[in-house]
């Protein structure tokens, strides 16, 4: 009989140890807290203001972007476009109402499609073409200012533009690249674009001359809204020569400078035909984009470089890594909280992308009633911009549950756009790169945690 009892107990023990609910997110008790760990996802998906992008350029008074074209981008996991306006008809005159209406229509369609743009204006696409005077540029920016303010929610970043061929601050016919004129134009750009919008200049020297220092800013400046904190970089000959066709003056020093600055301001652009260097391999591209913290890259140019990455199986990896890619490794809470008390919420957040988030977001802990589904949003102090690549961010918050009735609630994390126009749009919410936690209909990330308020 004793032998039978021992065998029965052994069977129960084995059965218990083999049980599994099949969930990849596992819970455990630690120091009285319920800890859940999460599986990282390898899926390619979109997130706002980052990734590979398509370029759409349009001449003066041309056709607006079609809704169908924008909606098709979602099939490519693209959330960002470069919208380049050539103002060749207006080198000596104000912008027409037709031109202004074109820009307004584009912004409306971007918003309807759930996308954003990198914005640039230029007067010519030819090296021997002409640009406009400082006075004309200033007048055009005055005309654009109210439109830009109204539509700042769908402007991810702005490339400085206006000067020279393609708006790349070279080949000017109006002496726009003298130190005095560069300062006038940058001052006007910073005044005309909303303070929330970061402006990218073509070379590090342009910014260094403007702010009168070669020392990269620190976090005290970088997370603010000063002019220094608003100037990032775009490179339209990325990895194409030793100095990227004149992008760098002192290559090593300039790259270090951009790497440090890019903790706070965006870098992005496109490749171009290589000169006296081999085409950028997967390993070279990985190294450069990691160092310089690239957040977006043009899909439409330069084709042979992009094909090199496709042929060597790193293109998909770059789809994941361009910009930010946030994931949660674990979260911990106390399962029971007193009515109108505070919930101690801890989470470890990682960023496996090349870059941080650059535009401020609003983060909320969502409590959703397990019975009835009523939702309560609790604002967090969490600044998602501070989750930088390769450094685990330790999120610790005491969340007031004032106003939340007694009951059982599941917990979710929402990171939404700072604009009230977009806050409720899932397309503009940050999706975490974890398995099985994204809710596409709400923009919530499920934490597989429940709390009981009593």
Spans of model-derived segments:
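Bacterial Sec-dependent N-terminal signal peptides
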Residues: 1-3, 10-37
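Extracellular/luminal regions of secreted and cell-surface proteins that mediate adhesion/ECM remodeling
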Residues: 24-25, 318-454
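Boundary/entry segment of secreted carbohydrate-active catalytic domains
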Residues: 27-80, 84
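Aromatic-lined substrate-binding rim segments of carbohydrate-active enzymes
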Residues: 68-124, 134-137, 197
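An active-site-proximal structural segment forming one wall of the substrate-binding cleft
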Residues: 99-115, 132-157, 179-192
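Active-site groove signature of glycoside hydrolases
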Residues: 118-127, 144-176
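Catalytic-core regions of glycoside hydrolase
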Residues: 157-159, 168, 173-302
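Catalytic cores of secreted or luminal carbohydrate-active enzymes
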Residues: 281-331
